[in-house]
C-alpha cells in the first residue's frame, strides 16, 4: 500500500502546485488590470532620460502604480544606479 500512497501523493502535490501557480498568475493579472495604459511608455521615457547621464540596464528601473479606495494614486519609481562615474 505504501507504493500506491506514494503515487497518490504525487498527484495531490502536482494539483496543489498547479493551483498555486494559477493563483499567482491570476493575482498578477488582477494587479496589472488597474494600471494606466501609458505606464510602459512612461517607464521607457524615464529610462531614456536616465541613460543620458548614467549607463543603466532596463532591469534597473522599477515602476509601480498603486491606487487605493480613496482614489489616491501613487507612482513609485525605483532606480538602481551603478557605482560608476556619470557619463557627461
UniProtKB/Swiss-Prot annotation:
Keyword Cell cycle found: yes
InterPro entries: MinE, MinE_sf
Record has Cell cycle as a keyword: yes
GO biological process: cell division; regulation of division septum assembly
Keywords, ordered alphabetically: Cell cycle, Cell division
Biological role stated in the UniProt entry: Prevents the cell division inhibition by proteins MinC and MinD at internal division sites while permitting inhibition at polar sites. This ensures cell division at the proper site by restricting the formation of a division septum at the midpoint of the long axis of the cell.
Family the UniProt entry places it in: Belongs to the MinE family.
Protein name: Cell division topological specificity factor
